[in-house]
Amino acid sequence: MSKVSQQNSTPGVNGISVIHTQAHASGLQQVPQLVPAGPGGGGKAVPPSKQSKKSSPMDRNSDEYRQRRERNNMAVKKSRLKSKQKAQDTLQRVNQLKEENERLEAKIKLLTKELSVLKDLFLEHAHNLADNVQPSSTENTTNPDKAGQ
């Protein structure tokens, strides 16, 4: 089986050429690959609006640079304060929930004790009722003297 392959190169956009490859022997067509057109021509395509901003580095002594740094520093400070406040709020909420949990656990203990006392009273009362209730027919049949009177 002989393998015949073909490569066609076509110029592309932004200095990138597209290579089309076909392999006739296997009957499959390979996916096109992107390669740089020339030396130093690789990399991502950058939109013109961002390209012009990044092309000239700012002078560290310029007013615009100082203003941008000041705005950035203020934004960072604000972000850090917000983060600290969020951490404090979370800690406060944790403490509140711990206190509430302790109160609820104490209430559970109290109610458990009360339930135990009430159960004991109920069982004692039920036992007393059972002891006080005796069949009257057994008294009459066991004592023949009272039965005839």
UniProtKB/Swiss-Prot annotation:
Region Disordered, residue ranges: 1-92, 128-149
Instruction: Cross-link Glycyl lysine isopeptide (Lys-Gly) (interchain with G-Cter in SUMO2): give the residues.
Output: 3
What Gene3D superfamilies does UniProt report for this protein, alphabetically? 1.20.5.170
> Region entry Leucine-zipper: which residue ranges?
97-118
Biased composition, class Low complexity, residue ranges:
28-37
CDD domains the record matches: bZIP_CEBPG
The highest taxon in the source lineage is Eukaryota
Which SUPFAM superfamilies does this chain map to?
Answer: Leucine zipper domain (SSF57959)
Q: Where is this region: Basic motif?
A: 66-93
State any GO CC term: nucleoplasm
Which intervals hold domain bZIP?
A: 62-125
Feature: compositional bias, Basic and acidic residues: 56-72
Q: InterPro entries, per this entry?
A: bZIP, bZIP_sf, C/EBP
Task: Provide the assembly information.
Answer: Binds DNA as a dimer and can form stable heterodimers with CEBPA and CEBPB. Interacts with ZNF638; this interaction increases transcriptional activation.
> What is the protein named?
CCAAT/enhancer-binding protein gamma
Q: Which gene encodes it?
A: CEBPG
